[in-house]
Curated annotation (Swiss-Prot):
The lineage of its organism: Archaea, Methanobacteriati, Methanobacteriota, Thermococci, Thermococcales. It is an enzyme of class 2 (transferase). This is 3-methyl-2-oxobutanoate hydroxymethyltransferase. InterPro entries: Pantoate_hydroxy_MeTrfase, Pyrv/PenolPyrv_kinase-like_dom, Pyrv_kinase-like_dom_sf. Homodecamer; pentamer of dimers. It comes from the Archaea. It comes from Pyrococcus furiosus (strain ATCC 43587 / DSM 3638 / JCM 8422 / Vc1).
Length: 283
């Protein structure tokens, strides 16, 4: 069992800020764990930042299992959280249970489900089975078509009520935490105060119990990123510089240098071997 558990995450509410970052492969997960994050999250955002999709709707269970397995192999300390992709739990509770089990078998410690009140029965069932669940309300990317696109949530009474109802339903169903995405900070603060489980914000202000960002946004791997994401590096430019230099050195015959390859020191030995090989192959 990893050091950080759902129980530990729940105990951090109001005491210590929870840190969460996405990771989609072995090397990024190694670094995230070494950096000390509490939660390493295999998000369905991989559809957009890894596979180039316009949204997360085309992400499959096979993709989530594949990436979860890679991340789980790397992480020794943090809690590994895996997203339930669109279509993996909407049809029925039974279908959701089957797919959640697959992610746990791939190495996840917990699963995340978008939505709250509408999926309370699934959350309750999974928790009873011993599968920890994190909920997700506010802007739910898997339902962005219904929401009218990617936009800030909580701008009217109806949305505030829905967000709070989702969070309370998740709490009652046994979820150990809830993500609040792109929610007005005042609303996120209200939810945080009204539920006993931790709230983890993304684009939802400082009044939550923790924060999550996408790996590629933190490192500046793309030209643009969401307005709520802070860039802590500009690796896109550094990577572009490095690979461009590699290409240039190959074109100019500068790579590989003598320190990057090995050859026979005794050329007579090689020439003898060469002659024998050529003769055997009749070249």
């Amino acid at each position: 069992m990893r050091e950080i558990t759902p129980k530990r995450i729940m105990e951090m509410k109001g005491k210590e800020k929870i840190t969460m970052i996405t990771a989609y492969d072995y090397p990024s997960a190694l670094l995230a764990d070494k950096a000390g994050f509490d939660i390493v999250f295999v998000g369905d955002s991989l559809g957009m930042v890894v596979y180039g999709e316009q949204n997360t709707l085309n992400v499959t269970m096979d993709q989530m299992i594949f990436h979860t397995r890679a991340v789980a192999k790397a992480v020794k300390r943090a809690l590994v959280l895996a997203d339930m992709p669109f279509g993996s739990y909407e049809v029925s509770v039974e279908e959701g249970v089957k797919n959640a089990i697959k992610l746990i078998q791939a190495g996840a410690d917990a699963v995340k489900i978008e939505g709250g009140y509408d999926h309370r029965k699934l959350v309750k069932k999974l928790v009873r089975m011993g599968i920890p669940v994190m909920g997700h309300t506010g802007l739910t990317p898997q339902r962005y078509l219904r929401l009218g696109g990617y936009r800030i949530m909580g701008e009217n009474e109806e949305e505030v009520e829905e967000i709070l109802r989702d969070a309370k339903a998740l709490e009652k169903a046994g979820a150990f935490a809830v993500v609040l995405e792109f929610v007005l900070a005042d609303v996120a603060k209200l939810v945080t105060e009204e539920v006993s489980i931790p709230t983890i914000g993304i684009g939802s202000g400082p009044y939550v119990d923790g924060q999550v960002l996408v790996w590629h946004d933190v490192l500046g791997l793309y030209e643009s990123s969401p307005p709520f994401a802070k860039r802590y590096a500009n690796l896109r430019e550094e990577i572009l510089r490095a690979i461009s230099e590699f290409r240039k050195e190959v074109k100019e015959g500068k790579f590989p240098g003598k320190e990057h390859y090995w050859e026979y020191q005794d050329k007579e030995t090689f020439n003898r071997i060469k002659e024998n090989v050529m003769r055997k192959l009749r070249l």
